[in-house]
């Protein structure tokens, strides 16, 4: 007598992910730095406070580690970074598109700065392994943050400014050490990025 054919595998295990928010969040955080999409991941993943907190903690850890770095943490040239100071009165009076543009441009410039720092460290005469690891992690994190902001609609809002609106040029300055670069990175995440995402997420919940 022929035995019955085994049942076909189902997708129930995979479809159970949306029923486990904590597991889905963990999977999203693991795959985001690799640039891999996560089936069922919420489009506004950055609205989960734990996500942004993770990147802020990484940035502050990198700043603390490089604070005592005496060798191999100075750059052979100055690197341009965004100004992270926030005038809260001015910020609240800014149009949503202007806020998005300032954050989007700042994140792009910060990404360029970290990449430039990565290249300078790699070409240093005596490269230090620990700072290099933190720079590599920052490069990956900034790519993930860019994807998260794009999913939140920041790029679309930044490009939706009317032609008659002339936003002020992005304020910048330069840094010459890895510690200063990571300090800017940390301040940007805790300041303008947190302010923008907080308001954008609240608007989406209305």
UniProtKB/Swiss-Prot annotation:
One of its GO terms (molecular function) is hormone activity. One of its GO terms (cellular component) is extracellular space. One of its GO terms (biological process) is positive regulation of Ras protein signal transduction. SUPFAM superfamilies: 4-helical cytokines (SSF47266). It is found in: Secreted. The keyword Signal applies. The keyword Zinc does not apply. Its main location: secreted. Produced by kidney or liver of adult mammals and by liver of fetal or neonatal mammals. Disulfide bonds join 47-201, 69-73. Pfam families: EPO_TPO. Keywords: Disulfide bond, Erythrocyte maturation, Glycoprotein, Hormone, Secreted, Signal. Residues 1-40 form the signal peptide. Glycans are attached at residues 64, 78, 123. It comes from the Eukaryota. Belongs to the EPO/TPO family. PANTHER family: ERYTHROPOIETIN. Hormone involved in the regulation of erythrocyte proliferation and differentiation and the maintenance of a physiological level of circulating erythrocyte mass. Binds to EPOR leading to EPOR dimerization and JAK2 activation thereby activating specific downstream effectors, including STAT1 and STAT3. This is Erythropoietin. The lineage of its organism: Eukaryota, Metazoa, Chordata, Craniata, Vertebrata.
